[in-house]
Amino acid sequence: MGYLLWLVTAYVIGSVPFGLVIARTFCSVDPRTGGSRNVGATNVARLCGTGFGVLTLVCDVLKGVVPVAVAMTFSDSAVFFSLTALAALLGHLYSVFLGFRGGKAVATTLGVFIPLAFTPLLVSALLCALVIWRSGFVSLGSLTLVTALPLMLLITGNFTYIPLALVVMTLVFWSHRENIGRLARGEEKPWQKKKHKEHE
């Protein structure tokens, strides 16, 4: 019963739309109606500035870290940790506070894997950053992250969380399906180029 209650709690924590709260509180804008119409850090940064985007990123990462880290204090079950991680991710993707809509779960993916598999995550995150830096596409970097993660888990011998990483990869690819379509058509907006144009 206690485990089930924590899974529900993890979902609720994951559901908190920090991007919406931050954008409304500090910028008086609704990220659901501006920019990419997403409540994630990238869109908040577009609409409110980099600082508020970073704040949103940190909060969304913590939505993943906290539920898993707390679960690890009262359980030693990798299956339970994986279920807790998925509950937090599903909360972010399908927030009870947003009519079961939400973000794209990349920041929260970072969060859930920090306590579970830090080294594979770090390598994957560096690859993600490199792709974003070289291409300007945050979406492409995000897809690189979740694709690299199960491979890094395999390479480092951390087989326990490969199933979780594969499920997460599927969820993140699904949440980016519109971005993938725009990338394929050459219509995706590069983050860096967009920012450069805004300052010209």
Curated annotation (Swiss-Prot):
Transmembrane segments: 3-23, 52-72, 78-98, 112-132, 153-173
Pfam families given in the database record: G3P_acyltransf (PF02660)
Domain of life: Bacteria
SMART domains: G3P_acyltransf
GO biological process, one term: phospholipid biosynthetic process
Annotated metabolic or biological route of this protein: Lipid metabolism; phospholipid metabolism
NCBIfam families assigned: glycerol-3-phosphate 1-O-acyltransferase PlsY (TIGR00023)
Protein name from the UniProt record: Glycerol-3-phosphate acyltransferase
Native organism: Oleidesulfovibrio alaskensis (strain ATCC BAA-1058 / DSM 17464 / G20)
